[in-house]
Amino acid sequence: MSEIMKIDTVRQYNDYFGVETLHLSVSVIEGCKAKPLRYCRKLYNLYAILLKDTDCGQLKYGQSCYDYRQGTMLFLAPGQIMGSEDDGRLHQPEGWVLAFHPEFLQKTPLARLIKEYSYFSYNANEALHLSEQERKIVLECMEKIRTELQHPIDKHSKSLITDNIKLLLDYCIRFYDLQFITRENVNHDILTRFELSLIHISEPTRRS
């Protein structure tokens, strides 16, 4: 098993991808603008939100494996490990990443609220699969954050950045809820059809 890389700062994360650091505590990375990388497992001491635009196969996330398909999001909290084993090849990153240091949230409402977003926990046990419309909303939120990072820092910067991070997190809660509701409806429909088939099979037996 390959060595685990520790990611302690936003600058270190940007250097890993080969992109410019616009802000010491927050980064939005567009994969196509990053350098080709070898796969590795990483210990995150940051919050990271990953959106993939290509099929990356299985990723190790904690003790679980996830099918990280196109249009999939994963959410990482400080202290969590994620990544794929090095296969010896360089790969061009795809998709988007939002990373932010937990200290950036201090003295903001999001510092208290962040623990309420349960998808940052290993216990969430499921990636978020986006529709095309949901993906568009996520990218709009990331673009807003990136635009603010490119703006000269002033007294409004921190609140605008954290507000837009919260907006993205709130949308993702909605999308997770829709994902679970959709699955429950599908499972209920499958169960109903299965029960009807059992009734259909048993009817000739009762008649005989």
Regions from the language model: what does each represent?
Residues 1-67:
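Generic protein-terminus/edge-of-domain signal
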Residues 87-150:
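A hydrophobic/aromatic-rich effector-binding and dimerization subdomain
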Residues 54, 78-80, 100-102:
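Residues immediately flanking
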Residues 200-208:
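Single conserved hydrophobic/aromatic residue that forms the stacking wall/gate
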Residues 133-185, 189-195:
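An amphipathic alpha-helical interaction segment
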Residues 74, 79-85, 105-106:
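Histidine-centered metal-chelating micro-motifs
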Residues 58-60, 82-90:
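Short beta-strand His + acidic residue motifs that chelate non-heme Fe in jelly-roll/DSBH
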